Amino acid sequence: MDNRPIGFLDSGVGGLTVVRELKRQLPHESIVYIGDSARAPYGPRPAGQIREYTWQLVKFLLTKDVKMIVIACNTATAVVWEEIKESLDIPVLGVVLPGSSAAIKSSRSGQIGVIGTPMTISSNIYEQKIKRLAPQMNVLSLSCPRFAPIVESNEINSSVAKKIVYESMAPLVDRVDTLVLGCTHYPLLRPIIQNVMGLSVKLIDSGAETVRDVSVLLNYFEINRSREVKDKTEEYYTTASVLGFKEIAEQWLGEEVTVQHVDLDKELEND
């Protein structure tokens, strides 16, 4: 047993889609979440910058004595997950491999679509993982740089959001039977994306798939939280507006949350 929290990091609010799934599947686990909304989105940034920012978030989580880290960001997973995983002595999960595995199981035609940030798509990480596991699969990848900013600005129900999604998704319509939401922000746009693609297309939420792997690793390393301990904690931190983060978090999680602002440079200056 290990009653320490699980740490989650993301470029902003997108990783809350993973947290929501964790709260559904493993409601007894404690959580520390850090969203770097002040520097979101990560997708258009150069790899070196993404690496630097992600390591800052990791170091912040380590100050909270987490027992596991979930990189709840596809872009960060693509750039630096392997390095972080090899560097730490606690389990570190990314969101790409679980999403890839689920897509392979779902597809009947062998035609899989992947949407993500410019960095995730240009890295070809999903195509590489899928092809390694199932060489016969055909992967169609599409960069959707305007999606994450819509979510960060909480405009997911706006007419502008619908227009952008419809225009962006057009190249994949009627071409795939399975679509990987290759950015943890994208499940917040799921109803619009599903409407564009049609009900016959299976949408794969890479973050939700990752929580299944979290459960497996908790059992494997025997670091589940004791169900007899009642003082479960949830801490949410943002590098940007507390009010903006809180509004989106409460809408998505369906409950009141306390959010704290963090200045990473000051927090880690003595590191």
Swiss-Prot record:
The processes (GO biological process) annotated in the record are: cell wall organization; peptidoglycan biosynthetic process; regulation of cell shape
Q: Which Pfam families match?
A: Asp_Glu_race (PF01177)
Tell me what reaction this enzyme catalyses: L-glutamate = D-glutamate
A molecular function (GO) term:
glutamate racemase activity
Q: Which residues bind substrate?
A: 10-11, 42-43, 74-75, 184-185
Query: Which residues does UniProt mark as catalytic?
Result: 73, 183
Which keywords, in A-to-Z order, does the entry hold?
Answer: Cell shape, Cell wall biogenesis/degradation, Isomerase, Peptidoglycan synthesis
The record, for SUPFAM superfamilies, names: Aspartate/glutamate racemase
Q: Into which EC class is this enzyme placed? A: isomerase
Domain of life of the native organism: Bacteria
Q: In which pathway does it act?
A: Cell wall biogenesis; peptidoglycan biosynthesis
Q: What is its EC number?
A: 5.1.1.3
Function noted in UniProt: Provides the (R)-glutamate required for cell wall biosynthesis.
Q: Which family does it belong to?
A: Belongs to the aspartate/glutamate racemases family.
| NCBIfam families, per database record | glut_race, PRK00865.1-3
Protein name as catalogued: Glutamate racemase
Organism of origin: Streptococcus thermophilus (strain ATCC BAA-491 / LMD-9)
- Gene coding for it: murI
